[in-house]
């Protein structure tokens, strides 16, 4: 049955794909891949990736017409000289100080035979036109095995304010350039498990988490697929976030009505002058960090130009957002 299905798919592609076309598996219309939490107690989480279809795009290469395979919501692996395939992502909340291991617990796929997948041009600057970058086949094209080989992987842990998270990467497209077989994984289910003490981006809390700002509550819902699972284990009070205004001294009077209006709206707002903090960006960074840990902080507003409120320098450029990295 599988062989028959593969043949039907191959004929369908060669007959109907003209330039770029969505090929539905569970949906006739282009829809984003699905990533959902099957169950999670934070120490262990099971995540399912589902593919409802994919897009094949014809690309003219030095070796003739070949294809780029993509899915809605995915992004190219961008491995120079390797088959140009998409990868998909999902983030989960993990323990504050644990290292996580990953295992694939189930998967299913369909195959497309006799298909040429074009090589990736890699990652390059926006100042370079893609048409100016030549196609090159890497050593992968001489290897009789599926690329990229692994079905899933973990990125380094990160901290997003109240939680420590980790991104799960799935590779639903696997291509063997020698046999010219493309495997499309319609389902990849993985399990993350705590596996010893964490070494990277460990979250050290000064106190237990019992309140979440409403604005960040929405961010967490969109960022972490197991956030709702986490809420069932811990009861958090969703509260209004606060604002700190750092203002150039000469503008303080003009900003008073703004601060008063914010407080009337129910957003606790405090204004301080630059002169009371210090004239350097490091002094402002230290003040913001101390304020965050002492009072909590959701919004930071800087009132003044760079000559009046200095900015941290990142790679030689001013970077106001760096004040938010605590």
Model-assigned labels for residue ranges:
Residues 297-326:
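Surface-exposed loop and adjacent secondary-structure segments within mature catalytic domains
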Residues 19-302:
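Extracellular pro-sequences of secreted precursors
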Residues 2-3, 210, 317:
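Intrinsic disorder/low-complexity signature
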Residues 2-11:
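Sec-dependent signal peptide recognition
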Residues 10, 18-19:
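Hydrophobic alpha-helical segments of integral membrane proteins
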């Amino acid at each position: 049955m599988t062989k028959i299905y593969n043949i039907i798919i191959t004929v369908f592609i060669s007959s109907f794909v003209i330039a770029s076309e969505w090929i539905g598996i569970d949906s006739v219309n282009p829809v984003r891949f699905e990533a959902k939490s099957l169950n999670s107690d934070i120490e262990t989480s099971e995540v399912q990736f589902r593919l409802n279809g994919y897009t094949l795009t014809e690309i003219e290469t030095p070796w003739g017409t070949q294809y780029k395979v993509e899915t809605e919501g995915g992004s190219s692996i961008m491995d120079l000289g390797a088959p140009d395939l998409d990868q998909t992502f999902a983030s989960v909340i993990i323990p504050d100080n644990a290292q996580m291991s990953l295992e694939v617990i189930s998967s299913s796929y369909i195959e497309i035979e006799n298909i040429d997948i074009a090589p990736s041009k890699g990652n390059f600057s926006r100042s370079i036109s893609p048409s100016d970058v030549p196609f090159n086949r890497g050593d992968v094209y001489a290897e009789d095995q599926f690329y990229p080989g692994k079905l899933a992987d973990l990125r380094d842990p990160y901290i997003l304010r109240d939680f420590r998270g980790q991104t799960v990467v799935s590779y639903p497209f696997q291509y063997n350039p020698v046999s010219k077989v493309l495997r499309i994984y319609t389902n990849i289910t993985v399990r993350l498990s705590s596996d010893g003490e964490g070494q990277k981006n460990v979250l050290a809390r000064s106190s237990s988490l019992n309140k979440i700002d409403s604005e960040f509550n929405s961010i967490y819902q969109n960022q972490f697929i197991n956030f709702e699972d986490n809420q069932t284990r811990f009861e958090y009070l969703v509260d209004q976030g606060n604002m700190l205004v750092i203002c150039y001294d000469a503008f303080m009077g003009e900003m008073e009505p703004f601060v008063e209006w914010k407080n009337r709206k129910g957003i606790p707002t405090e204004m301080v002058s630059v002169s009371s903090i210090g004239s350097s960006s490091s002094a402002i960074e230290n003040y913001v960090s101390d304020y965050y840990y002492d009072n909590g902080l959701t919004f930071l507003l800087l009132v003044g130009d760079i000559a009046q409120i200095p900015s941290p320098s990142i790679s030689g450029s001013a970077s106001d957002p760096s004040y938010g990295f605590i």
